[in-house]
Amino acid sequence: MTPACPLLLSVILSLRLATAFDPAPSACSALASGVLYGAFSLQDLFPTIASGCSWTLENPDPTKYSLYLRFNRQEQVCTHFAPRLLPLDHYLVNFTCLRPGPEEATARAESEVGRPEEEEEEAAAAASGLELCGGSGPFTFLHFDKNFVQLCLSAEPSEAPRLLAPAALAFRFVEVLLINNNNSSQFTCGVLCRWSEECGRAAGRACGFAQPGCSCPGEAGANPATTTSPGPPVAHTLSNALVPGGPAPPAEADLHSGSSNDLFTTEMRYGEEPEEEPKVKTQWPRSADEPGLYMAQTGDPAAEEWSPWSVCSLTCGQGLQVRTRSCVSSPYGTLCSGPLRETRPCNNSATCPVHGVWEEWGSWSLCSRSCGRGSRSRMRTCVPPQHGGKACEGPELQTKLCSMAACPVEGQWLEWGPWGPCSSSCANGTQQRSRKCSVAGPAWATCAGALTDTRECSNLDCPATDGKWGPWNAWSLCSKTCDTGWQRRFRMCQASGTQGYPCEGTGEEVKPCSEKRCPAFHEMCRDEYVMLMTWKRAAAGEIIYNKCPPNASGSASRRCLLSAQGVAYWGLPSFARCISHEYRYLYLSLREHLAKGQRMLAGEGMSQVVRSLQELLARRTYYSGDLLFSVDILRNVTDTFKRATYVPSADDVQRFFQVVSFMVDSENKDKWDDAQQVSPGSVHLLRVVEDFIHLVGDALKAFQSSLIVTDNLVISIQREPISAVSSDITFPMRGRRGMKDWVRHSEDRLFLPKEVLSLSSPGKPATPGAATAGSPGRGRGPGTVPPGPGHAHQRLLPADPEESSSYFVIGAVLYRTLGLILPPPRPPLAVTSRVMTVTVRPPTQPPAEPLITVELSYIINGTTDPHCASWDYSRADTNSGDWNTESCQTLETQAAHTRCQCQHLSTFAVLAQPPKDLTLELAGAPSVPLVIGCAVSCMALLTLLAIYAAFWRFIKSERSIILLNFCLSILASNILILVGQSRVLSKGVCTMTAAFLHFFFLSSFCWVLTEAWQSYLAVIGRMRTRLVRKRFLCLGWGLPALVVAVSVGFTRTKGYGTSSYCWLSLEGGLLYAFVGPAAVIVLVNMLIGIIVFNKLMARDGVSDKSKKQRAGSERCPWASLLLPCSACGAVPSPLLSSASARNAMASLWSSCVVLPLLALTWMSAVLAMTDRRSVLFQALFAVFNSAQGFVITAVHCFLRREVQDVVKCQMGVCRADESEDSPDSCKNGQLQILSDFEKDVDLACQTVLFKEVNTCNPSTITGTLSRLSLDEDEEPKSCLVGPEGGLSFSPLPGNILVPMAASPGLGEPPPPQETNPVYMCGEGGLRQLDLTWIRQSEPGSEGDYMVLPRRTLSLQPGGGGTAGEEAPRARPEGTPRRAAKTVAHTEGYPSFLSVEHSGLGLGPAYGSLQNPYGMTFQPPPPTPSARQVPEPGERSRTMPRTVPGSTMKLGSLERKKLRYSDLDFEKVMHTRKRHSELYHELNQKFHTFDRYRSQSSAKEKPSPPGGRPGLSQHRRHQSWSTFKSMTLGSLPPKPRERLALHRTAAWEPTEPPDGDFQTEV
């Protein structure tokens, strides 16, 4: 070896160590991984040289690699540090290597109590380690197959690093080599050979060892004494050169592999080189920097020669060929470059044979026997081999035993009786004997076997004179399998003598058989397909077995039952032997965790199992067999936690008890009843919970307690020292944070005095009475607890008596529903209270007198004769225990709870006789009162809906729409009430039914509130728009939907539907989600009703107008309006007609009657649904619900005036006071109803064209104006400004003023009077118009009608004059108001046209007209005016309906022809879509009168200012009819500003109206 090789190797190893070490947790311990070879010193391994420091080397795969170590002895290192090696399976961070002291050794011995002997020996060997300095030789060789090897400095004085020489610290005393056991490389074999060579040289004799795949050649010229086997000398072979070979010769000393640690200090010999065999080299040189990476080699390329390609790995199909090359460079020199192995694919044209393959096993067949032990089988098929492959190996049929339900006990035969006489007096005959069957009970079956026994008997031969009968043959099969059948047997007559006679008797015998009655057709259950399973036809009483559904494995059973009426029906299937695939997979995962050798890993695996089990049970979709399987999983988890050194975390404990809470939920009662037929799983669960409580309690500190709260159980665990129990124990603590409501409101209580816990006797077995719920075995020692049924292991309490008796672990559990699933007591008793469990370990000695006080509340009301009882595990008559009523005393019984006083700690409950009606099964259909009440209410409401649908076009209004929604909510509620009473609903359907029932109950209340709100808006005169109607819908349907959505979101549907009814649960406060909103709605409805009633009384109750104004609010500026403004939304007071008040009062009365009845109906419905046993609540609901339907129908249908009028007209009975041409008259029984638009047009035309005062009846005008409406299909058109500055006014008729005093003569000037302000509709709403700049206050005739043009007219000056007429000028700014008289009469006003009385030339008969107020009416003189009637040929105006005088008497047909003929009113349609177009056409007709006015205006054309002096007087007498429309652009700036409408600050405009202005509610 050259001097440069060790130097280069040391540099490479130092770099390797620098990167291979993992970051150490401290400077005193380090972990190295990925080291192939290295020689290390103290300075390399221990940066901080101190006692207890360690250096750990990792073996990447103990099954594939082995660690070889050589220790080079150095006296100073051995003296000061005493290094030793520890083989480890796991690496422990910051593990100290110091030898344990006496105290630590004792503690470690205590912690190892209970371990197997093998584990104790292994632990002792690991703790002591291997002393490296124990041998006498210079070298120590070690071989390890462990995961880790740790080098420790066990002893080191503080001054040792300063006393050691630097050479000793730098001395490489440890060499490490990692060898592949399957394929050793040349480098590793060379290192082993070098170690053997150096060992032989140092010892002075031959030294050798064997390694599979390596052999060391013999050195040339060696001493014959150093070799043990002859061989040819190898020339020019280096001592460290190694040729891979086969196994070493037997003469070599083997270095054994495995888990043993072998120490070699003796010399080793070289072996003989075997024959060279080709090997495939798969070892790449690994990098010295990163483990798992390969490093390129460098060296002489000429020394690298590839071997020939190997034979193809496969004889058929595509395989691989491999070739290798060897690196012959020195291990201490440069490394070779390039890979040592290459592969390439090789193709073979031969077809590979395909062996036969078994398919999946089929499903297991049914058990061969219906009871007892039978067998089940399954088969599989083999896919046939191909191309000469092998056939399938293994059985095709597989069988296993199966155990079904126990067979009925058969009776026992008594002894046989004596033989009877022989049947024949001569020759051969038969004898019979019989026996009796003893049946002990009615459930026993008959005896199996024959009742009689027959044998042949021999007599003397009969005389030959007569014939004789031969023997009887066997009885034939019965002719019927059921009912009475027949069996026959025959015998033959043997030949008689020549003088004899034939045989006497008959050769056939018949007897009845099969007296079992055949089931009738109605006593047979038919074939049924349920849950993906087919149940075949069976007779009543038979049990049919079937395979479980596809998502489970096992067998399901079902019994055919017989009802009280004698009709067969299928019972519920039993799935107690069905296990879901998910639960079975979880159990397999549990077995895998249990198979782990490491206890810590097994404990962590149990946490994962509990988490998975919680997720499965949270889905609530499992079979009864899954519950039993879950109990077994929890038992295994508890046992694993006990054996493992793993303390369950708080989350693990919470999940464990949450799983138990899911399992004992009341919804699983039927599943537990089904599972009890196979195994008492609820009792096993009770014991598992007690064991887990003590497991958690052992991990607690002294005086520490733990409280776990779930939906169905509350657990309290605390640990108290035996010597000083702090205080008495009271459970549960209702005031604790996070406690459930069912615990806070219950009266369950446990009082455990501390004297009971101070009576224990450590070291002595508890007396038979001291067995607690946690230690059910009575008469046993405290060290063991017998396992329950199915338990595979026994629990060993701590063996140390001081530790086991120094602390009490006290556990108390309050179960909410455990009494429903535990095995029931003997009838007629039943568990009628909650169940409470108290367990204490170590067990206490029972006191001399009862000191434990337990108070338990009832879960079933109406029970009698209560008894306190405890669960006794030692009852001999049952294998799991039973209730014992003798262990507790019943102190007092109250209406809500019972107080008990017991002597032993156990599981307590109250047993009593349930009420008789509780034993009756609830019917699957709703009760008769509920059906009657819902049916009557639905029929009444459907009648109302049918009537409204028939007359909808005549009675359509907001009130009707609200009523229809209200009826729909009540109908849906009645239907859901009937659906929710069915017991066949699933959990999801029941939850949805409860949620929708909650929604429709609230919506019915909300629609009553909506009706009250609509009444209030009608009374105050606010116009309803589409926005308001949308608010009605939001209140009626949106508010209930919001309440239900919030409730469902917060509760996650918990509480919506229970196992008894489909309604809100009475526990948990969810019922307030219905009671609270309903109460608020009733209160708000009452307040609105009071307000509406006060407003109606304040308006209709005061007769004097002045008092009414003083009593009311301040008069609004738009109160004088007789028409609504389409822009501001103001409604004038005349529109609030008496019909509005009447409708509002009717709506108010309806709310006052319907709302209380609605509240009583739903309250009785809730009581009837939640308590189905009470017939009183069901009867009350039927009465209230029926009355509610009749009242709603009567109020809104039979008593409603609109419906009555429509029905009368349909029947041909209308008002008799109307004329034949009345728009609402009926002819020949046919209804002639004019649209609202036609009525308005008719009234406007009569008022404008014929200025008859008597036709302008105020009541008629008010009634007509109250019917004004807009088209519902069109958006409202607000008042907009025209393109030229003009105003667009409402197309509806204008201001109609009723004369309040005597009308002056037509030729007399009207007396001066104060005119009402005029309002205009603009963009901003309603504004008052200033008219003082146009003229003085000159009122027109009170009968004048103001027409508002629909659209902007061409308001150009000088409309009626000649072409040369001057344009009018507006009044300049600052001109006084009286100067307005000088304004030319051709100046138009942009909004109104004044209409004078039309002169018709009626004659004297028209002169004595009286107005409605009794004043004499003088007709005006016939002067030429713009409103005069033209020539007879041009006369085509509409005549009034009733005109006094003979000259106006025309036939109805002529009047109809004359009516509106020139106005072309045939275009008037009943639809409202053409209202706008017809109004525009009507206004154009009105403005055609301007051409007649132009002639009179030309005659009286005014002169310019300064002209005739009588001009002002003439203009003073002009009326408003002389003004025409003009644009705002023609006005001066100042007058234009004065024309701007003023907005009153006392009121705010509303939104544009959309819909009718009807004030009907």
UniProtKB/Swiss-Prot annotation:
Induction: Down-regulated after hypoxia. Residues 757-797, 1355-1377, 1417-1447, 1491-1561 are annotated as: Disordered. Residues 1366-1376, 1491-1502 have a biased composition (Basic and acidic residues). Residues 300-353, 355-408, 410-463, 466-519 form the TSP type-1 domain. Residues 1519-1528 have a biased composition (Polar residues). Residues 748-918 form the GAIN-B domain. GO terms for molecular function: G protein-coupled receptor activity. Residues 1551-1561 have a biased composition (Acidic residues). Residues 21-930, 981-988, 1052-1072, 1137-1147 are extracellular. Specifically expressed in the brain. The peak level in the brain is observed 10 days after birth. Residues 952-959, 1010-1030, 1094-1115, 1169-1561 are cytoplasmic. The modification Phosphotyrosine is found at residue 1345. Its main location: membrane. Disruption phenotype: Deficient mice show significant resistance to depression after repeated stress in the social defeat test. Additionally, hippocampal cell proliferation in deficient mice is increased. The chain crosses the membrane at residues 931-951, 960-980, 989-1009, 1031-1051, 1073-1093, 1116-1136, 1148-1168. GO terms for cellular component: extracellular region; glutamatergic synapse; plasma membrane; synapse. Residues 1-20 form the signal peptide. The record marks 287-288, 905-906 as: Cleavage. Glycans are attached at residues 94, 182-183, 257, 347, 428, 551, 636, 861. It comes from the Eukaryota. Glycosylated. Autoproteolytically processed at the GPS region of the GAIN-B domain; this cleavage modulates receptor activity. Additionally, furin is involved in the cleavage at another site, in the middle of the extracellular domain, generating a soluble fragment. Disulfide bonds join 312-346, 316-352, 327-336, 367-402, 371-407, 382-392, 422-457, 426-462, 437-447, 478-513, 482-518, 493-503, 525-560, 548-578, 868-900, 888-902. Heterodimer of 2 chains generated by proteolytic processing; the large extracellular N-terminal fragment and the membrane-bound C-terminal fragment predominantly remain associated and non-covalently linked. Interacts with GABPB2. Interacts (via carboxy-terminus) with TAX1BP3. Interacts with GNAZ. Interacts with SH3GL2. Belongs to the G-protein coupled receptor 2 family. Adhesion G-protein coupled receptor (ADGR) subfamily. This is Adhesion G protein-coupled receptor B2. It comes from Mus musculus.
